[in-house]
A protein has these predicted regions:
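Short secondary-structure boundary/capping segments within folded domains
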Residues: 29-33
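Core alpha/beta structural scaffold of self-assembling particle/tube/pore-forming proteins
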Residues: 1-26, 39-42, 64-227
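N-terminal low-complexity, intrinsically disordered segments
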Residues: 35-67
Length: 227
């Protein structure tokens, strides 16, 4: 408590030294998915054949080829439990809980931004597939959009150029759900400590359902191995 109050017993404004500027969350396009679990997209994989013809000659019919892909959304969730008596010590319960909310909101933002780049269901099935695994193989079909800067260090960086749009790259949220981060005040509850003892606490639930769809791989370029 002493670290979370000023000499007058009030809750001060906490210096958010761990905060980050995640412009990608402001830049990306959010769109309601067509599935309760995410988005089903149809991607064109081949163009129809077209022909030059001469007079009195016919041409064969042709058609394009497509593929269906289901992009699943991930569920990012956190729960805050603040000791009721601790929150009431300074006489401003709402302000104390708000100072705790700020930390959770920042953590949710940072995790979403990180997953948008590095999420990999192959190593963690609960996450959605991010940009780096999609554009991480220089021998893949989309390698034409991966530019190798040639760095050989152990801490190389990448730059991603993304054209956001409903038909290019966007972030779906499950059909019938809310976009973005939701905040639910669960009120006063009896909670358990790690030693099994109980106490009264104010509980808050945070949730963010989100995914990533690259409908047209040509609208993302990765410049990798920047030393």
């Amino acid at each position: 408590w002493a670290k979370r109050s000023d000499p007058d017993g009030r809750v001060p404004i906490v210096a958010e030294l761990l905060s980050q500027s995640n412009e990608i969350l402001d830049d990306c396009v959010f769109k309601e998915g067509n599935l309760p679990t995410g988005e089903r997209v149809v991607i064109r994989t081949g163009l129809p054949g077209v022909y030059w013809r001469a007079l009195n000659q016919g041409i064969p019919s042709s058609k394009s080829t497509t593929a269906q892909i289901d992009e699943a959304c991930g569920i990012l969730e956190a729960r805050s439990e603040v000791d009721k008596d601790l929150a009431m010590l300074n006489g401003n319960t709402a302000q104390f809980r708000l100072s705790e909310d700020t930390a959770f909101l920042e953590a949710m933002n940072q995790t979403q931004a990180e997953t948008m780049f590095y999420g990999n269901p192959g190593t963690d099935p609960k996450k959605f597939l991010g940009l780096a695994p999609r554009y991480g193989d220089l021998s893949a079909d989309n390698a034409v959009n991966i530019l190798n800067a040639g760095g050989s260090g152990s801490d190389n960086a990448s730059v991603y150029l993304v054209v956001w749009g409903d038909n290019t790259v966007y972030c779906p949220f499950p059909k019938g759900s809310k976009a973005g981060l939701t905040h639910e005040d669960l009120g006063e509850q009896t909670v358990y400590n790690s030693d099994g003892t109980r106490l009264q606490a104010f509980a808050t639930r945070y949730q963010w359902k989100n995914g990533l769809v690259v409908k047209d791989w040509r609208y993302v370029v990765r410049i990798c191995n920047i030393d």
